[in-house]
Amino acid sequence: MKTRLFLPVVLFAASFVTGLQAQTNKFDLPIAAGPFVGTTASLTNYTYPKWFRDAKFGIWAHWGPQSVPMEGDWYARKLYQQNQADYTNHLERWGHPSTNGWKDIIPLWKAENWDPEKLMELYKKAGAKYFVSMGSHHDNFFLWNSKLHRWNAVQMGPHRDVVGEWQKAATKNGLPFGVSEHLGASFTWFQDAHRSDRTGPLAVVPYDGANSNYWDLYHPPADPTDRGWYSKNPQWQQEWFNEI
């Protein structure tokens, strides 16, 4: 069995390109040739890096603006669903999502007590053999110093390169480092931000996602039939590929 060499930074993709691959003839997808092709026979010739087979315990930091409301990692979506407890929570704490939505939560994430080096030392003492940082959740907010759009942790919130600082701390402690991305589902995941209350005094008043000034965060509105986990929207699929 061959063993693939481990690169200093590994991208652990939490999203898959299944839906995209079926339509590759429609997009510009310059995928570089690698050590194997997408067949079972090819994949059986490779195995995990030795260090990973021996690493029984690693730590993944699924951490971002979701820590402001402290109501789970899907808060950015559920605050736009009138039947959800997160909607009521948001209404009471920050106001109606037609004016105060996820875009207004992001700047509240300051990370003022975050000390990645101290945490990494603690993780290593706990027995961690590798560390993975989230790069972006379904909320389309990037945790690194991105040039792709303004919704990133250097331009907003903590004004720090979260992924970069995690990487430096992991490298200093001799831990292999990876990044997870969750953008594949973002386009349809965020479509509730384009809708409105169905009942009550603000029924049919659009949520803030309907404002085109924020489509670089919430995405443009999807076709009504586009409701799958992975969007059929070709523009989004190309954008996702380019970002990753």
Each language-model region and where it sits:
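Bacterial N-terminal signal peptides that target proteins for export
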Residues: 1-9
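Bacterial N-terminal signal peptides
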Residues: 8-17
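N-terminal phosphate-binding caps/lids of nucleotide- and nucleic-acid-binding domains
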Residues: 20
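Mature catalytic domains of secreted/periplasmic carbohydrate-active enzymes
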Residues: 23-244
